[in-house]
Amino acid sequence: MSNVSTASGTHFAPPQADRSVTEEVDRVNSRPDELENQEVLRQLPENGNLTSSLQREKRRTPNGKEAERKHALPKSFVDRNLSDVSPNHSLDHIMHSNEHDPRRGSDEENMHRLYNNLHSSNNNVHSKRNSKREEERAPQRRSSSVAYTQQQFNGWKKEFGHAFKKISAIGRLKSSVNSPTPAGSGHRHNQHQHQQVNEEDLYTQRLASDLLDSLLAGCPASLFASTQFLRDEHGKRRAPLLLAKLDVRVSPLKNDNNILDITNSNHNHRGNNNNNTGENSDRRPSIPRSSSIISISSNVAEFMYSRNENSLFRIHLEYGIDEDRLKWSIIRSYKDIKSLHHKLKIVAFQQLTISKLYSDNNRYHSLQLPHFPHYKEMVKERNVMEKKAENKPSSAASAPHTSENNNNDNGSNITSLETLSSSEISEFNIDNVKMKHLQDLIDEPDDFSQPIHLRLERYLRLLNIALCLRPHANRLFEFYELSPLGNLLSRESGFQGKQGYLVIRSTAKAQGWRVSHFGKHAFKDMIDRHTTKWFLVRNSYLTYVSDLSSTTPLDVFLIDWKFKVRFSGNKNNILDNENEINWIIHDPNLEINDELEEFGIENDANNILDKNGKSKTHQKKSNISSKLLLLTLENSERKLKIICKSESSLKQWMSSIIKMSTSTPWSKPNRFGSFAPVRTNSFCKFLVDGRDYFWSLSEALLMAKDVIYIHDWWLSPELYLRRPVKGNQGFRIDRMLKSCAEKGIKIFIVIYRNVGNIVGTDSLWTKHSMLNLHPNIHIIRSPNQWLQNTYFWAHHEKFVVIDETFAFIGGTDLCYGRYDTFEHVLRDDAESLLDQNFPGKDYSNARIADFHDLDKPFESMYDRKVIPRMPWHDVQMMTLGEPARDLARHFVQRWNYLLRAKRPSRLTPLLTPPSDLTAEELKSLPMFEILREKSTCETQILRSAGNWSLGLKETECSIQNAYLKLIEQSEHFIYIENQFFITSTVWNGTCVLNKIGDALVDRIVKANQEKKPWKAFILIPLMPGFDSPVDTAEASSLRLIMQFQYQSISRGEHSTFSKLKKLNIDPAQYIQFFSLRKWSTFAPNERLITEQLYVHAKILIADDRRCIIGSANINERSQLGNRDSEVAILIRDTDLIKTKMNGDDYYAGKFPWELRQRLMREHLGCDVDLVEFVEKKFERFEKFAAKNYEKLHTLSKEGDSGNNWSDREMIDSAMIELGYREIFGCKFSPQWKSGHGNSVDDGSTQCGINEKEVGREDENVYEKFFNSVDYGKSSRKRTPLPKHNFASLGLTFNHRAGIENVGIRDHKVLSTDPRLRKNDEHKKEVDGYGPDCWKKESNKKFKADATEQLKEWALNSLASKVLDDKEMIKSEIPEGFSNYLPNEKDLEMYLTDKTVTNRNKWSMLKRICYLQYLSHKLDERKTQRLKKIKDMRRHLSSSTESTRNGSNSLPLNEKSNEGESTNVDQDIEGDEYHRLHEDILKNQELDDGSLDDLLSQIIPKITNFNSGEIDDAKKEELLKLNFIDPYSFEDPLISSFSEGLWFTIALRNTLLYKLVFHCQPDNAVQNWKEYGEFTELEQEFQINQEKLIDLEAENINSTTTNVVDKDREKEKMRKAAELRMKLSGSLLYGFNQKVFDKHTAQRILERIHGHLVIFPTEWLAKEVESRNWIFNSDRLSPMEIYN
């Protein structure tokens, strides 16, 4: 075991019980010189120069002071070798030594000095003097060592004294025997190893070895822990840092203007993760550990006299022993180091005096300090040497004694402190220290002839050992600018600046804190706020703690683009002119280079220009001085005034802060006035609807390692992220977050604080439910309406950041009602909770009733068999890397602001912002290698923030600025989905200020003037999501919001339509508003229902090249910035795809282009899961064809012109071949067979067709992004893993919340929720012993079900296809698709036709594949529907029988699960199903021909856009359209899509909905009377459905029982006649008044495609004109709430 060190320098090693080892120790101690002589003789060089060997020997000898030891080498041998020194070699050696000397002369001077040294007798003089000195010091060292060791053991455990002596001996034995050649020896093996490991790393290895030995010794390790109980002279706890891990190097600096050329004076970094450039940025400069006396003896005088107490030194420091050890450097003057020494001597004297006043002499142990090298000592020593040289020129070898024990006597007259005798304050004795990393100091004494920087380095290194375990180390940490918090923050990349004590002068209010001035603790708190604090300058912020040893930040001051730094002493108190800059930069302690350019000043200290441009010489004393020593920091939020200790300190802080602010991108202004810069090469993935978002989030939470930030308007703890409940109980969000917290992950949540029952979110339940899960979960509700005087606005952001690396941002809250799929079902009537997709409160309809009783999550709010749920459409997106860091910074800023404003009752930590990702850190992220090719987006985080939400002095509205710019710069179209559309209008004296409406008008006017096509597609909800009918007094919010929307769109002179009409522009040609609606059948009687599909997305897509996704609505609240707080992201994809725009070739960004198509396909009824599945399949075909095209292509050997085929042509042919095999289900096509034959191996063997054999690395975006990381169990065969694990980034400081970062709190009682206090049932329910039966489920089954759920989404009903054998084209396919699926011969002719391009063939194969899957899926639905009819018959029969028996109870619906196989009687189909109600309805039920005639009469005339004539062909197409091609969405501007498909489908769907349901809002309803009529018709339709259901039940019962009851038959006929009369009588008032029977209505609704309808812009317009729309009570509310 190597020697180890403690506070006293005594070395220990583990005790050895072996007797032989003890005997060996005694032998070694008795004969040390003999062993050393043998060792030295073995290491002597056989030939060559001895000088370099002597230099190496100084480092090698373990116990000696110099290489020229008497016992090591005979004098004659030394003299002989010295006389044989080669001049050339000595010159190289001396020049190498001198190159580190700041006062070295020219080459000629060095040559002259070399000649004098080689031919003088100084060599022998120094050798004899040092030998004599060594003899005199030997007995003294031994006696001192014994006394010193005895004293230290008396202070500790005396009973361990004997054991520790043996440990010390064993340590020396292992150093001599096990390591016969010490570090730096001449062994060949060690020499070879030394060539590979540089001196710096070798020293660090020794340091680590010493530290490890100390910890393994046991007692030193316990002493390290005991330092936490120590207090310094000020009562401060000793900082928990190990001085044994600190390395110090000192290099001189010239005190001239060249100091400006040196960089990174106050910069620290970890290992090689530093991204700064400069001479000292990555590696400490090589400083000689010792200097040869030969090389510097002739210029000692020059060196000593040229220095003074203002000499500057750069101190290079390293803390740690690993590769990422902390490295930094500071600049100190000789006076600073001397002042440190004097302060420590004062403390030592005080403790010595106090110890004498007490009988217990051990109350304070003597503080032993190493000797400090004084300049005057060197002068005196030089004078003595010169006098002796004059008096005794022949005996120049008798040099003065320079023992360290006598150095105090030489400098005893320097200060009064030096008069303390060495007996009173004992001096640190290096002879008792046996440590590897101090071996160079042990080998070489403190010699006056050494350069002062080496002597200071020696002093500081010994001081580290002397104060290693003492509380006085705090002074040393302050001197080194080393603190525990700085060490914890050192993992951050970027600039790391100065640390030190400062005093805060500014008031709490100016700093942004809300404090009380009248509480019992107010005065004490005020005093505490203005005492000294330990400040740290970090990469993009400043922070401070209470003292050096604290790790709990008391404030975090962020740098932003409005950051300013000011200092006192000038007129304007602003750093804005040349003199003020010069006043800072010409302090030699400072280093500012490129930063001066920020102020327009060139860095030329010798040639400074005055205001007239003339050169002037810099004066030593500036005209500007600082008397107040005050620094004022200001950002966009607040001010911070701090007082420095001295003018020099003020300049140093100014320098560090300016360098930090200029090095960070956060101090630069950004596009759109945003707080965040533009980021490039970002990965982005859109997530449409809650299903995709929730699944992806659950996967990301499983990957979390560090911190999780959640910012939501509302968060429901009982929300399931995966559905159905069965098998996914563990994916409930509170359980997932609890699991993360138990792993040590820190979770921070911000939610909106609702006021009473005005908003039914129950944030109090959310807060305490989450807090009760685990201490690692922290949550803040905001705003506090009463304290902040904010009653109307809300924190509306919706984003999640995981590990400051992954981010999800958009419009979806993690709460009830947001989960949905692309199908947007209206029903979920499963009896069991485990089978429900929308369990408990998640089954919601805001138009019926708002949320209530949220503390009962599993209780439904409505009758699921009567009231449909309101579907929810939303868009979220996921990003990786730098944009996630920007979002994390916004969260940190919000969190810290809320802490300053609220002062929570619980300990809640302040957070530090993340540093910017470096290139190395980005590469170490998981999935970086996988997603690097897809990381092509340019992104920027935008936000709406103001004074109330973030404390900003100036409101930020970068979201509105981006909206306006994208609309202005759009060339072809914009596509908007938003919850509201309130903009640029005036109503009832209220002016809407956001300019989005004006931007649309301006762009339309420009398009009209240029005669170029331009369109705006805008989707908004049919009605806002507020409960109560619009004609009731309770619907005040609903009416006011709709009024503002209509005023913005079509009503009033300030509306968009009115502004365009004034310019004779038809708005319909350029801007169209749409909405979404859904219909379904409702169990148990298949009753027809409808409900609006609520649009909650907040997106804008411009020209398929740029898009905005976020939480901001188009209204005043979200856009202005000073109301609701919002966040969004702007995306521009640089990966361009060739497509079409208005029929011309066009290059679109991949991300916006795919997002728009995904949304439009969903709205028009395409199966987007199938489209995505087909796209992934054919994408694999493309990759496989590109690798195997030579074996797969079907082209002839030569082309048409006789030339060979190009690679592109062969790849296209191979792709078509693979597509052919997929569609036709064969092994090869006839064309391939004719060219290759049966026996030729194409290399595929169905690979690329059979999905089980294809490399599925790109099969699914979510699986590829989340599941490809290797956690030790997954295979490496398919997906390449990142080179570095995610953990290589390390844990951030925010991960230490609650531990090192304890947090702050106010003096008030803890807040609680009585519903959760001592609520054991809720705790059991969270643990899994509740209604969802989590703990009762089999873990194995649970994991399997959860893992396969995502595949069930996309692969549901895809297990088999309609065409799966050779006769597949001829097999039965659903009616309606027979016109679109071609027969086999037609498809083959198409694929072999040379006139058809390969691109069209490839596109056709995709369409056919999609139709095959879709037809099978519809066939499955038909089977399920027939089964439901059979169940309905059984139910109706049973209900009738039970009614007859006088029972009112109905049996449960015997509904089987969707996935179960059913045996449905095929005789129910067609005519037999029709006969169930034909006797009742007779001719009232319309057939398909009658429906076509009816629709042709009610559909309005369609005018051709180009010719202006009535287009009958388009009207016919509108009637018979029953298929949407999912690959016809590429060109949104061409009239065949925008008018012929998009608008046509919306118009037809709108008419069909009105025809059946008479639903509102609708343009046909102009006044309250018509509103009432439509409401009555809607109710009548529902009543008629119920009557028809009852009659069918009776008819079924009579058919099944064959019982003739005349009275009952008559009653049935009467009811049927009455129903027919109602149905026929309704036609008298026109088709708008027609009420259809259920079966005719269902036939009409089956012609609806998708969910798209036209937004009614003229609903109840007459009532608005007559001022009857708004109730009088509506005018009482503040209009700012609703616009």
UniProtKB/Swiss-Prot annotation:
Domain PX: 291-487
Location of N-acetylserine modifications: S2
Keyword RNA-binding belongs to the record: no
Catalytic site positions: H796, K798, D803, H1096, K1098, D1103
Residues bearing the modification Phosphoserine: S8, S30, S145, S1461
Key word Zinc present: no
Keywords, comma-separated and alphabetical: Acetylation, Hydrolase, Lipid degradation, Lipid metabolism, Meiosis, Phosphoprotein, Repeat, Sporulation
Basic and acidic residues composition bias: residue spans: 20-34, 63-82, 90-112
Extra facts: Present with 49 molecules/cell in log phase SD medium.
Annotated family: Belongs to the phospholipase D family.
UniProt subunit comment: Interacts with SRF1.
Protein name: Phospholipase D1
Gene that encodes the chain: SPO14
